[in-house]
Amino acid sequence: LGDFFLGTDYDYINEVLDKLNGRIHLVVGNHDTPSKITWYTSWNNIIEIADALRIKYKKREFFLCHYPVLTASLEQDPNRAVINLFGHTHSKEKFYEDRPYMYNVAADAHDNRPISIDTILNDFDEKVKECISFLGEE
């Protein structure tokens, strides 16, 4: 989410983009300069460029943004809460400040590998249970 590429080696970027499957919904980050964004629009597999997006998957709602954003609290029903997916922090932690509704999808937090949305939901469900259990012990 955001900072699609650092640097300006457009030949390398072309090489990587040619290998990607599917359609790309690009959320802009602080290193995605106006010239890069203009260049991204020339790619057929990038179908959308936005500052933020909302998506639904398996009846769960996600807010995609480059930056961590608080979208819910533990008082909400976890099945109805909006989960923020972000990348900006370059942290190795999956959750921002240990909050289950703020999930870091940056490669830094996942051994420099992409992760599936089902893995995110699994991690989220486990974190919510952990937080609720912790709050119940107080």
Segments the model singles out, each with a brief description of its role:
Residues 1-57:
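Core catalytic region of metal-dependent phosphoesterases/phosphodiesterases
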Residues 25, 42-137:
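Conserved beta-sheet core of the metallophosphoesterase superfamily
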